[in-house]
Amino acid sequence: MIDPQLLRKDIAAVQARLATRKFQLDVEKFNTLESERKSLQTRTEELQAKRNQLAKAIGMKKGKGEDAAAEMAEASQINVDMESGAARLSVLQAEIADFLMGIPNLPDESVPAGKDETENKEVKVWGEQPMFDFEIKDHVDLGGPLGLDFEVAAKISGSRFVVLKGPIARLHRALAQFMIDTHATHHGYQEVYAPYMVNAASMRGTGQLPKFEEDLFKVPRQMGGEDEGGEAKTENFYLIPTAEVPVTNLVRDEIVNADTLPLKFVAHTPCFRSEAGSYGRDVRGMIRQHQFDKVELVQITKPEHSMQALEELTGHAERILELLELPYRKVLLCTGDMGFGSTKTYDLEVWVPSQNAYREISSCSSMGDFQARRMQARFKAGQGKPELLHTLNGSGLAVGRALVALIENKQLVDGSIAIPKALQPYLGGLETLKPN
């Protein structure tokens, strides 16, 4: 959530910055809500002052033995008016909060302006695209003999699911373990095991709710008893779309000791996404699934360190690609292609030979204080006043897409897969992965 004071100070400037994100700020609605809020607060203060005056007058009259009935009647009416005003103010503040919840983050000044992904800025290219002297296969054809099975997954669950068996399941597990170990041992992250289902407050904290509910898998749970309408009481849980949600929420409603910052967490979880807006896209293979594994990096920092932390976190994700010997490029997203809560984002795109294209394998973002304000996540130095933290997150990496890139880039003429040296210890020293 952006700072409401920015809207109150210079709403035109905020409107202009949001327009670069293709977001049209409803200035009229905010001004209407804000005008009523100010009016109610002013009226409440006036009534409070009047009530205080009447209380003194009533006390003086009673002290003198005089009749204070008129003043008491007026004070009673003021109490009624104040209760009514407080009720309306509470509703109004909730409406303002809902309005603010729907506004995306403001882009950092270093982010290039642009309408969509065609105007993103390539900032780095690493590695050489492999040259093959045989007709290459895509990961679906390569993966079949290695244990990749979409047919049985469709029978069990439907489209956009996969079953991994045998050699390819082992490779998938090895990739995740390699990523976790590298980040925990060499990059200084604390490993976290977190819930795969979270409550609505956690989803609101990181920005998935209310805007992106259709992209989530909701799991209602009956709590027992009935609500006021006679319906069974239920509580909604959500399957996590990314470990960013539970891990970032570790600091929700907390005041962190400044001396402990930065906090650096890594988690390996399955991720669940409905892909509501992706009909017809990437229908073949593992690129876009309802369930996929990801190793997620999260950093919690002081405001003055967040941009430096973004470079560091992105570098940690890049290191995984380099150790896996996978060609990639690093792209700075323009304002029109950024995620809802991001103030600055780098995408890492890995080379996929069968598509003759780079495909996203990691997105690394600084959220500034956007999530922290929603979560009331703060830090405190000494006897100072609590301040909002800055939060960052990134994939380090998406395991399924790493698997796709690895078997396609490292394929051999006989259908076996050359294993990068860094990954060999996780596969018992295997140099090549062969079909059963």
UniProtKB/Swiss-Prot annotation:
It is an enzyme of class 6 (ligase). GO terms for biological process: selenocysteine biosynthetic process; seryl-tRNA aminoacylation. L-serine binds at T242, A243, E244, E296, S395. It comes from the Bacteria. Gene3D superfamilies: Bira Bifunctional Protein, Domain 2, Serine-tRNA synthetase, tRNA binding domain. It holds the Pfam family Seryl_tRNA_N. ATP binds at R273, S274, E275, E360, I361, S362, S363. Keywords: Aminoacyl-tRNA synthetase, ATP-binding, Cytoplasm, Ligase, Nucleotide-binding, Protein biosynthesis. Homodimer. The tRNA molecule binds across the dimer. It catalyses: tRNA(Ser) + L-serine + ATP = L-seryl-tRNA(Ser) + AMP + diphosphate + H(+); tRNA(Sec) + L-serine + ATP = L-seryl-tRNA(Sec) + AMP + diphosphate + H(+). GO terms for molecular function: ATP binding; serine-tRNA ligase activity. Belongs to the class-II aminoacyl-tRNA synthetase family. Type-1 seryl-tRNA synthetase subfamily. Its EC number is 6.1.1.11. One of its GO terms (cellular component) is cytoplasm. It is found in: Cytoplasm. Consists of two distinct domains, a catalytic core and a N-terminal extension that is involved in tRNA binding. InterPro entries: aa-tRNA-synt_IIb (IPR002314), aa-tRNA-synth_II (IPR006195), aa-tRNA-synth_II/BPL/LPL (IPR045864), Ser-tRNA-ligase_type_1 (IPR002317), Ser-tRNA-synth_1_N (IPR015866), SerRS_1_N_sf (IPR042103), SerRS_core (IPR033729), tRNA-bd_arm (IPR010978). Pathway: Aminoacyl-tRNA biosynthesis; selenocysteinyl-tRNA(Sec) biosynthesis; L-seryl-tRNA(Sec) from L-serine and tRNA(Sec): step 1/1. This is Serine--tRNA ligase.
